[in-house]
A protein has these predicted regions:
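Glycine-enriched, solvent-exposed interface loops adjoining structured elements
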Residues: 1-231
Length: 231
């Protein structure tokens, strides 16, 4: 369902008389309140977990010789990820290859904590040591920090999670899989039920929302991994 369809379905499920909305743009009063509840429900679902797999995407950028850090942004010398759409790095997904060679020369990059990176690669003469980077870190400002500092063009790739976003146009479609779209409707029903003192609507929304969220949590989050046995 798109944004408009979600709003229409919410009105129907809440038992609100009348029809519509016919658009999500330029509404007022009760219809605008309904539209806001749907958008709030969508935001609530997105922010329940930062690492929903439908928020995960991949970025690539090319290093600049003698430049160790790459800030968020889309201009020259950045990591190519817009601040507006960035949510969180998936730090265990980074790799690189010499740009001139191609991905036949690809290697994984180990993540290290920022203080370790700073004390290792940004100290004394090591600041000026340039070669192929084999480790990476994330600064407090969410910049990508490479170690050692690259000595030429390397293509860096890694995954990150998109920031939560609101819907604004009739045809906007939420990013979560279609089989879970009704979770937005059920969560919006809870807002309607609380506002209108309609416990039957609230309780039905809460029950069905809980069912879908449990399924989504089991199906759409990274698999849990376990540490090896202690020596």
């Amino acid at each position: 369902m798109d944004f408009l369809g979600l709003c229409q379905r919410t009105r129907q499920e809440c038992g609100i008389s009348g029809s519509g909305p016919t658009t999500v743009v330029g509404q007022s009063g009760n219809l605008q309140r309904l539209i806001d509840w749907v958008n709030t429900a969508w935001m609530d679902i997105q922010t329940t977990h930062q690492d929903w797999n439908w928020l995960r995407t991949t970025m690539t950028f090319t290093t600049v010789s003698a430049q160790a850090t790459y800030a968020l942004g889309t201009g020259s010398g950045t990591c190519g990820v817009s601040v507006a759409t960035f949510g969180m790095w998936n730090r265990d997904t980074f790799r690189n290859y010499p740009t001139a060679v191609g991905n036949r020369g690809e290697v994984f990059m180990d993540f290290i904590h920022f203080q370790t990176w700073r004390d290792t690669y940004q100290y004394g003469a090591l600041r000026y040591t340039t070669t192929r980077p084999v480790q990476m870190s994330i600064s407090p400002e969410k910049s990508i920090c490479l170690g050692p500092t690259p000595n030429g063009d390397y293509t860096i790739s890694g995954d990150y999670y998109l920031a939560p976003s609101l819907m604004s146009a009739d045809a906007d479609v939420p990013a979560l899989p279609a089989q879970y779209h009704m979770a937005i409707v059920y969560r919006a029903m809870m807002s309607y039920g609380a506002y209108e003192s309609a416990p039957e609507v609230y309780q039905r929304g809460e029950l069905e929302f809980g069912k879908l969220m449990r399924r989504m949590t089991a199906d759409r989050l990274p698999e849990a991994t376990w540490a090896g046995a202690l020596a």
